[in-house]
Regions:
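Extracytoplasmic "Venus flytrap"
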Residues: 51-72, 76, 80, 85-101, ...
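Flexible loop/hinge segments that line or gate small-molecule binding clefts
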Residues: 119-158, 178, 273-281, 285-286, ...
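Hydrophobic alpha-helical segments within soluble ligand-binding/sensing domains
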Residues: 97, 152-178, 221-223, 272-276, ...
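Short, solvent-exposed amphipathic alpha-helices that sit
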Residues: 65-79, 159-166, 189-207, 225, ...
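Bacterial lipoprotein signal-peptidase II cleavage site
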Residues: 28-36
Protein backbone atom coordinates (compact mmCIF):
# COMPACT_ATOMS: atom_id res chain seq x y z
CA UNK A 1 0.00 0.00 0.00
CA UNK A 2 2.74 2.48 0.93
CA UNK A 3 4.65 1.68 -2.24
CA UNK A 4 1.57 2.47 -4.31
CA UNK A 5 0.98 5.77 -2.53
CA UNK A 6 4.56 6.92 -3.04
CA UNK A 7 4.48 5.88 -6.66
CA UNK A 8 1.21 7.79 -7.23
CA UNK A 9 2.45 10.98 -5.58
CA UNK A 10 5.66 10.77 -7.55
CA UNK A 11 3.71 10.35 -10.75
CA UNK A 12 1.36 13.26 -9.97
CA UNK A 13 4.23 15.60 -9.27
CA UNK A 14 5.81 14.57 -12.56
CA UNK A 15 2.56 15.20 -14.41
CA UNK A 16 2.21 18.64 -12.76
CA UNK A 17 -1.39 18.28 -11.79
CA UNK A 18 -1.00 18.09 -7.99
CA UNK A 19 -2.54 16.02 -5.29
CA UNK A 20 -6.07 17.18 -6.13
CA UNK A 21 -6.22 15.26 -9.43
CA UNK A 22 -8.65 12.39 -9.93
CA UNK A 23 -7.54 8.90 -8.98
CA UNK A 24 -5.71 6.90 -11.60
CA UNK A 25 -7.36 3.89 -13.23
CA UNK A 26 -4.25 1.77 -12.69
CA UNK A 27 -0.68 1.95 -11.47
CA UNK A 28 0.63 2.09 -15.01
CA UNK A 29 1.49 5.57 -16.25
CA UNK A 30 -1.46 6.91 -18.29
CA UNK A 31 -1.28 9.53 -21.05
CA UNK A 32 -1.17 13.13 -19.78
CA UNK A 33 -4.45 14.06 -18.09
CA UNK A 34 -6.66 16.84 -19.53
CA UNK A 35 -7.03 19.96 -17.35
CA UNK A 36 -9.74 19.50 -14.74
CA UNK A 37 -13.17 20.72 -15.85
CA UNK A 38 -15.71 22.50 -13.68
CA UNK A 39 -18.63 20.35 -12.67
CA UNK A 40 -21.53 20.77 -15.09
CA UNK A 41 -25.01 21.44 -13.72
CA UNK A 42 -27.62 18.81 -14.28
CA UNK A 43 -30.12 21.51 -15.39
CA UNK A 44 -29.75 24.67 -17.44
CA UNK A 45 -28.78 27.71 -15.36
CA UNK A 46 -31.71 29.95 -14.41
CA UNK A 47 -31.99 33.18 -16.35
CA UNK A 48 -31.20 36.32 -14.40
CA UNK A 49 -34.39 37.51 -12.72
CA UNK A 50 -35.84 40.66 -14.25
CA UNK A 51 -37.17 43.47 -12.08
CA UNK A 52 -40.91 43.42 -11.53
CA UNK A 53 -42.99 45.55 -13.87
CA UNK A 54 -46.27 47.04 -12.67
CA UNK A 55 -48.71 49.00 -14.81
CA UNK A 56 -50.34 51.98 -13.10
CA UNK A 57 -53.40 53.23 -14.98
CA UNK A 58 -55.15 56.55 -14.24
CA UNK A 59 -58.53 57.35 -15.71
CA UNK A 60 -56.89 60.05 -17.85
CA UNK A 61 -53.29 61.20 -18.15
CA UNK A 62 -54.40 64.79 -18.86
CA UNK A 63 -55.96 65.15 -15.39
CA UNK A 64 -53.56 67.00 -13.04
CA UNK A 65 -55.05 65.16 -10.05
CA UNK A 66 -53.07 62.14 -11.14
CA UNK A 67 -49.69 63.89 -11.54
CA UNK A 68 -48.92 63.57 -7.83
CA UNK A 69 -49.98 59.91 -7.92
CA UNK A 70 -47.50 59.32 -10.72
CA UNK A 71 -44.73 60.95 -8.68
CA UNK A 72 -45.59 58.72 -5.72
CA UNK A 73 -45.53 55.60 -7.88
CA UNK A 74 -42.13 56.54 -9.30
CA UNK A 75 -40.72 57.22 -5.83
CA UNK A 76 -41.89 53.86 -4.52
CA UNK A 77 -40.64 52.04 -7.60
CA UNK A 78 -37.18 53.53 -7.08
CA UNK A 79 -37.16 52.42 -3.45
CA UNK A 80 -38.22 48.88 -4.34
CA UNK A 81 -36.04 48.49 -7.44
CA UNK A 82 -38.98 47.79 -9.73
CA UNK A 83 -40.48 49.37 -12.83
CA UNK A 84 -43.84 51.14 -12.78
CA UNK A 85 -45.29 52.09 -16.16
CA UNK A 86 -47.83 54.94 -16.33
CA UNK A 87 -50.45 53.71 -18.82
CA UNK A 88 -53.79 55.42 -19.41
CA UNK A 89 -55.91 57.16 -22.04
CA UNK A 90 -55.16 60.78 -22.84
CA UNK A 91 -58.66 61.77 -21.75
CA UNK A 92 -61.26 59.81 -19.80
CA UNK A 93 -62.24 56.86 -21.99
CA UNK A 94 -63.16 53.49 -20.49
CA UNK A 95 -62.86 51.56 -23.76
CA UNK A 96 -59.43 52.96 -24.54
CA UNK A 97 -58.28 52.26 -20.99
CA UNK A 98 -59.41 48.63 -21.33
CA UNK A 99 -57.53 48.28 -24.63
CA UNK A 100 -54.32 49.60 -23.10
CA UNK A 101 -54.65 47.18 -20.19
CA UNK A 102 -55.29 44.24 -22.52
CA UNK A 103 -52.02 45.09 -24.24
CA UNK A 104 -50.28 45.01 -20.85
CA UNK A 105 -51.79 41.59 -20.11
CA UNK A 106 -50.37 40.33 -23.41
CA UNK A 107 -46.91 41.53 -22.30
CA UNK A 108 -47.30 39.54 -19.09
CA UNK A 109 -46.61 42.39 -16.68
CA UNK A 110 -46.33 41.45 -13.02
CA UNK A 111 -49.21 43.48 -11.60
CA UNK A 112 -51.68 46.29 -12.26
CA UNK A 113 -53.12 49.22 -10.31
CA UNK A 114 -56.15 50.83 -11.95
CA UNK A 115 -58.34 53.90 -11.44
CA UNK A 116 -61.42 52.73 -13.32
CA UNK A 117 -63.25 55.03 -15.70
CA UNK A 118 -66.29 52.80 -15.47
CA UNK A 119 -66.72 49.84 -13.09
CA UNK A 120 -68.60 47.67 -15.57
CA UNK A 121 -66.49 48.50 -18.62
CA UNK A 122 -63.26 47.70 -16.74
CA UNK A 123 -64.52 44.53 -15.05
CA UNK A 124 -63.78 42.16 -17.99
CA UNK A 125 -60.18 43.31 -18.44
CA UNK A 126 -59.54 43.15 -14.68
CA UNK A 127 -60.92 39.63 -14.61
CA UNK A 128 -58.80 38.64 -17.63
CA UNK A 129 -55.68 39.89 -15.86
CA UNK A 130 -56.50 38.01 -12.66
CA UNK A 131 -57.27 34.84 -14.62
CA UNK A 132 -53.88 35.21 -16.34
CA UNK A 133 -52.15 35.31 -12.95
CA UNK A 134 -51.57 39.07 -12.93
CA UNK A 135 -52.63 40.55 -9.57
CA UNK A 136 -54.82 43.66 -9.85
CA UNK A 137 -55.72 46.31 -7.30
CA UNK A 138 -57.82 49.41 -7.86
CA UNK A 139 -57.22 52.91 -6.52
CA UNK A 140 -59.24 56.13 -6.59
CA UNK A 141 -62.12 54.56 -8.58
CA UNK A 142 -63.17 50.96 -8.09
CA UNK A 143 -64.72 48.09 -10.02
CA UNK A 144 -66.25 46.35 -7.00
CA UNK A 145 -67.78 43.42 -8.88
CA UNK A 146 -64.52 42.48 -10.58
CA UNK A 147 -61.93 40.01 -9.31
CA UNK A 148 -59.59 42.78 -8.17
CA UNK A 149 -57.86 42.07 -4.87
CA UNK A 150 -58.34 45.33 -2.99
CA UNK A 151 -59.40 48.94 -3.46
CA UNK A 152 -57.21 51.75 -2.08
CA UNK A 153 -59.11 54.99 -1.61
CA UNK A 154 -60.71 57.39 0.77
CA UNK A 155 -64.22 56.47 1.86
CA UNK A 156 -66.03 58.47 -0.81
CA UNK A 157 -69.37 58.30 0.96
CA UNK A 158 -68.01 59.44 4.33
CA UNK A 159 -66.14 62.34 2.72
CA UNK A 160 -69.16 63.39 0.65
CA UNK A 161 -71.42 63.29 3.71
CA UNK A 162 -68.99 65.60 5.46
CA UNK A 163 -69.08 67.90 2.46
CA UNK A 164 -72.87 67.92 2.56
CA UNK A 165 -72.88 68.77 6.27
CA UNK A 166 -70.65 71.74 5.51
CA UNK A 167 -72.95 72.88 2.68
CA UNK A 168 -75.98 72.63 4.98
CA UNK A 169 -74.13 74.75 7.53
CA UNK A 170 -73.10 77.33 4.92
CA UNK A 171 -76.68 77.73 3.62
CA UNK A 172 -78.57 77.49 6.92
CA UNK A 173 -79.37 81.21 7.11
CA UNK A 174 -80.10 81.66 3.41
CA UNK A 175 -83.69 81.63 2.16
CA UNK A 176 -82.51 80.25 -1.18
CA UNK A 177 -81.16 76.74 -0.69
CA UNK A 178 -80.80 75.58 -4.29
CA UNK A 179 -77.65 73.75 -5.33
CA UNK A 180 -76.17 71.99 -8.35
CA UNK A 181 -73.67 69.16 -8.65
CA UNK A 182 -70.78 68.86 -11.08
CA UNK A 183 -69.55 65.36 -11.89
CA UNK A 184 -67.08 63.85 -14.33
CA UNK A 185 -67.61 60.60 -16.23
CA UNK A 186 -71.19 59.40 -15.76
CA UNK A 187 -71.22 56.02 -14.03
CA UNK A 188 -67.74 56.28 -12.49
CA UNK A 189 -68.08 54.36 -9.22
CA UNK A 190 -66.30 56.91 -7.03
CA UNK A 191 -68.24 59.87 -8.41
CA UNK A 192 -71.61 58.13 -8.15
CA UNK A 193 -70.87 57.28 -4.52
CA UNK A 194 -70.05 60.92 -3.76
CA UNK A 195 -73.21 62.23 -5.40
CA UNK A 196 -75.44 59.69 -3.70
CA UNK A 197 -73.98 60.31 -0.23
CA UNK A 198 -74.05 64.08 -0.61
CA UNK A 199 -77.71 64.10 -1.54
CA UNK A 200 -78.61 61.67 1.26
CA UNK A 201 -77.55 64.38 3.71
CA UNK A 202 -78.30 67.60 1.83
CA UNK A 203 -81.80 66.92 0.53
CA UNK A 204 -83.44 65.82 3.80
CA UNK A 205 -81.85 68.88 5.45
CA UNK A 206 -83.88 71.14 3.16
CA UNK A 207 -81.40 71.88 0.38
CA UNK A 208 -82.98 71.85 -3.09
CA UNK A 209 -81.12 69.96 -5.79
CA UNK A 210 -81.36 71.53 -9.26
CA UNK A 211 -79.20 69.37 -11.54
CA UNK A 212 -76.20 67.09 -11.84
CA UNK A 213 -74.05 67.95 -14.86
CA UNK A 214 -71.23 65.74 -16.23
CA UNK A 215 -68.03 67.10 -17.77
CA UNK A 216 -66.27 63.79 -18.58
CA UNK A 217 -63.29 64.70 -16.39
CA UNK A 218 -62.37 67.44 -18.86
CA UNK A 219 -61.24 70.86 -17.63
CA UNK A 220 -62.53 72.88 -20.58
CA UNK A 221 -65.79 70.96 -20.66
CA UNK A 222 -66.13 71.57 -16.92
CA UNK A 223 -65.74 75.32 -17.42
CA UNK A 224 -68.46 75.30 -20.07
CA UNK A 225 -70.81 73.18 -17.95
CA UNK A 226 -70.51 75.45 -14.89
CA UNK A 227 -70.96 78.63 -16.89
CA UNK A 228 -74.00 77.14 -18.65
CA UNK A 229 -75.51 76.05 -15.35
CA UNK A 230 -75.10 79.52 -13.89
CA UNK A 231 -76.67 80.99 -17.02
CA UNK A 232 -79.68 78.76 -16.47
CA UNK A 233 -79.70 79.27 -12.68
CA UNK A 234 -78.02 82.60 -11.92
CA UNK A 235 -79.31 82.65 -8.34
CA UNK A 236 -77.86 79.25 -7.42
CA UNK A 237 -77.05 79.19 -3.69
CA UNK A 238 -74.56 76.33 -3.65
CA UNK A 239 -72.34 74.21 -5.88
CA UNK A 240 -71.01 70.78 -4.97
CA UNK A 241 -68.19 69.69 -7.25
CA UNK A 242 -67.68 65.93 -7.00
CA UNK A 243 -64.50 66.71 -8.88
CA UNK A 244 -63.23 70.26 -9.35
CA UNK A 245 -62.12 70.06 -12.97
CA UNK A 246 -63.03 73.66 -13.95
CA UNK A 247 -61.13 74.98 -10.93
CA UNK A 248 -57.91 73.40 -12.20
CA UNK A 249 -57.73 75.92 -15.03
CA UNK A 250 -57.91 79.69 -15.41
CA UNK A 251 -60.60 81.14 -13.15
CA UNK A 252 -60.91 84.10 -15.51
CA UNK A 253 -62.49 81.73 -18.02
CA UNK A 254 -65.49 81.52 -15.65
CA UNK A 255 -66.83 85.05 -15.17
CA UNK A 256 -70.29 83.83 -14.14
CA UNK A 257 -68.79 81.54 -11.52
CA UNK A 258 -66.67 84.38 -10.12
CA UNK A 259 -69.64 86.72 -10.00
CA UNK A 260 -71.87 84.14 -8.30
CA UNK A 261 -69.22 83.25 -5.71
CA UNK A 262 -68.59 86.90 -4.91
CA UNK A 263 -72.36 87.39 -4.58
CA UNK A 264 -72.58 84.66 -1.95
CA UNK A 265 -72.81 81.29 -3.72
CA UNK A 266 -71.14 78.63 -1.55
CA UNK A 267 -68.81 76.09 -3.11
CA UNK A 268 -67.74 72.75 -1.67
CA UNK A 269 -65.34 70.95 -3.98
CA UNK A 270 -63.31 67.79 -4.18
CA UNK A 271 -59.50 67.82 -4.27
CA UNK A 272 -56.81 70.17 -3.02
CA UNK A 273 -54.97 71.23 -6.13
CA UNK A 274 -52.91 74.40 -6.07
CA UNK A 275 -55.47 76.53 -7.94
CA UNK A 276 -58.27 75.39 -5.65
CA UNK A 277 -56.32 76.25 -2.54
CA UNK A 278 -55.67 79.75 -3.85
CA UNK A 279 -59.36 80.17 -4.67
CA UNK A 280 -60.23 79.15 -1.12
CA UNK A 281 -57.88 81.82 0.22
CA UNK A 282 -59.60 84.34 -2.07
CA UNK A 283 -63.02 83.37 -0.72
CA UNK A 284 -64.35 81.89 -3.98
CA UNK A 285 -64.36 78.34 -2.59
CA UNK A 286 -65.45 77.48 0.93
CA UNK A 287 -64.39 73.90 1.61
CA UNK A 288 -62.10 71.38 -0.10
CA UNK A 289 -62.06 67.62 0.39
CA UNK A 290 -58.54 66.33 -0.13
CA UNK A 291 -57.66 62.92 -1.46
CA UNK A 292 -54.34 61.20 -0.82
CA UNK A 293 -52.96 61.76 -4.32
CA UNK A 294 -49.41 60.77 -3.48
CA UNK A 295 -50.59 57.62 -1.74
CA UNK A 296 -52.44 56.48 -4.87
CA UNK A 297 -48.97 55.90 -6.23
CA UNK A 298 -46.60 55.51 -3.30
CA UNK A 299 -48.72 53.52 -0.87
CA UNK A 300 -50.70 51.55 -3.43
CA UNK A 301 -47.56 50.41 -5.30
CA UNK A 302 -46.28 49.19 -1.93
CA UNK A 303 -49.51 47.27 -1.38
CA UNK A 304 -49.27 45.54 -4.75
CA UNK A 305 -45.60 44.74 -4.11
CA UNK A 306 -46.57 43.15 -0.78
CA UNK A 307 -49.18 41.05 -2.57
CA UNK A 308 -46.86 39.92 -5.37
CA UNK A 309 -43.60 39.43 -3.45
CA UNK A 310 -44.55 38.89 0.17
CA UNK A 311 -47.89 37.15 -0.47
CA UNK A 312 -49.55 39.48 1.99
CA UNK A 313 -53.34 39.50 2.16
CA UNK A 314 -55.38 42.70 2.19
CA UNK A 315 -59.05 43.39 2.90
CA UNK A 316 -61.30 44.35 -0.03
CA UNK A 317 -61.04 48.04 0.92
CA UNK A 318 -58.12 50.02 2.34
CA UNK A 319 -59.25 53.44 3.63
CA UNK A 320 -56.76 56.26 3.05
CA UNK A 321 -58.70 58.85 5.04
CA UNK A 322 -59.17 62.37 3.66
CA UNK A 323 -58.11 65.94 4.32
CA UNK A 324 -60.54 68.80 4.92
CA UNK A 325 -59.44 72.34 4.10
CA UNK A 326 -61.63 75.29 5.17
CA UNK A 327 -59.31 78.07 6.31
CA UNK A 328 -56.50 80.06 4.66
CA UNK A 329 -54.08 78.61 7.22
CA UNK A 330 -55.05 75.06 6.30
CA UNK A 331 -54.72 75.97 2.63
CA UNK A 332 -51.17 77.22 3.24
CA UNK A 333 -50.13 73.82 4.60
CA UNK A 334 -51.00 72.16 1.30
CA UNK A 335 -49.73 75.00 -0.85
CA UNK A 336 -46.36 74.35 0.78
CA UNK A 337 -46.54 70.74 -0.37
CA UNK A 338 -47.16 71.88 -3.93
CA UNK A 339 -44.28 74.33 -3.69
CA UNK A 340 -41.75 71.84 -2.30
CA UNK A 341 -43.04 68.66 -3.93
CA UNK A 342 -42.79 66.92 -0.56
CA UNK A 343 -45.97 64.86 -0.13
CA UNK A 344 -44.55 62.19 2.15
CA UNK A 345 -45.07 64.16 5.37
Amino acid sequence: MNTKKVSRRTFLRAAGIGAGAVALASCAAPPPAAPPQAAQPTTAPAAEKKPLTFVWSPKAVNNPVFDVARRGAQDKAKELGITVEWVGPESADAQKQAELLDAAIARKVDGMGISCNDPDALKPVIDRAMDAGIPVITWDSDSPNSKRITFYSLDNEAAARKGAEIMVELLKDKPNKTYAILTGVPGAQNLEARIRAFREVADPAGLQWVATDPCNDDIQKGIEVVENRLTANPDLAGYFMAGAWPLFGDINAMPKFQAAAKAGMKVVAWDILENELKLLKEGLVHALIGQKFYGWGYDAVGILYDIVVNKKEYPPFVDTGFDLVRTPEEADVFLKKWETGNWKD
